[in-house]
């Protein structure tokens, strides 16, 4: 089966099974502990396994849109990459890049309903407008549309795919923060 179709079908089966698209609820249902990082960091999120116990950590300052995307991405790692957290730096970067792309495809299918993105795209909205309407980043819209094309949907256009776009988003950039953190004293940490 084509990888694009497999991920799409896996996500839809998961949504059907869980009765939700909410990545936080699904992670909890899958017995993954979801916690914010205790300190400020540029890292958006991380999936790890510690002695058989699965964790997702996320940047505590993220706004809800970004947090949802990060949790959906980390859920993709939980679903497909059980050994992801164990990859050593000596391993191939292409394997890591491929796993990042799979997690992004998973997140795009989880957070974006096919009928919603197709309807908005056919109405003539551009990627940035669609992303705004759907509360995701444009990169996820590009991934979703590209994957739908690969599955045979007739969609005009070329969609640039960045497998590592999350890596380029810094958790310490205020534009990604929840408004409660924007004017906080940067020297204050609530542990």
Go through the PLM ranges and name each one.
Residues 1-191:
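Active-site hotspot residues in diverse enzymes, especially metal/ion-binding acidic/histidine motifs
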